[in-house]
Amino acid sequence: MEMLQGLLLWMLLSVGGVWASRGPLRPLCRPINATLAAEKEACPICITFTTSICAGYCRSMVRVMPAALPPIPQPVCTYRELRFGSIRLPGCPPGVDPMVSFPVALSCHCGPCRLKTTDCGGPRDHPLACAPQTSSSCKDPPSQPLTSTSTPTPGASRRSSHPLPINTS
């Protein structure tokens, strides 16, 4: 009887874990829209733009007795397919490349974290945003698409959540 109770408890916990991972509180790994900041040290203006990144829940496990066995590799939500987009930073001095490239997620999957290409979490040396300055360095996105031949007209506000058209050629 005790073995049957243990088996029943194990089944309930297993099924409950699956239900919890598929619920609305934990969306699965998928491309989502995110607003990022682009800046270069020599260029005076930082701009925000919207692109797609990989984000969401990946099933993982933690050992009950971590000291007895080596850690289990934890999957992360990462790119399956991607392309690169680019934007032109306005106001860069001559001799400084004003183009900034960034990945655009086409599809995502749960897989190992590759430190060369992926932010695997943990502490950061700097925030992923425009550096605070005495003057306003972050600008609203321009009204026209950014390509290698167009330059945005700086806006007046500090931040924007409006999408910035990007060149993804």
UniProtKB/Swiss-Prot annotation:
The keyword GTP-binding does not apply. One of its GO terms (biological process) is G protein-coupled receptor signaling pathway. One of its GO terms (cellular component) is extracellular space. Keywords: Disulfide bond, Glycoprotein, Hormone, Secreted, Signal. Coiled coil: none annotated. SUPFAM superfamilies: Cystine-knot cytokines. Residues 1-20 form the signal peptide. The keyword Glycoprotein applies. CDD domains: GHB_like. One of its GO terms (molecular function) is hormone activity. InterPro entries: Cystine-knot_cytokine, Glyco_hormone_CN, Gonadotropin_bsu, Gonadotropin_bsu_CS. Glycans are attached at residue 33. Residues 131-169 are annotated as: Disordered. It is found in: Secreted. It holds the Pfam family Cys_knot. Disulfide bonds join 29-77, 43-92, 46-130, 54-108, 58-110, 113-120. Residues 145-158 have a biased composition (Low complexity). Heterodimer of a common alpha chain and a unique beta chain which confers biological specificity to thyrotropin, lutropin, follitropin and gonadotropin. Promotes spermatogenesis and ovulation by stimulating the testes and ovaries to synthesize steroids. Belongs to the glycoprotein hormones subunit beta family. This is Lutropin/choriogonadotropin subunit beta. The lineage of its organism: Eukaryota, Metazoa, Chordata, Craniata, Vertebrata. The gene is LHB.
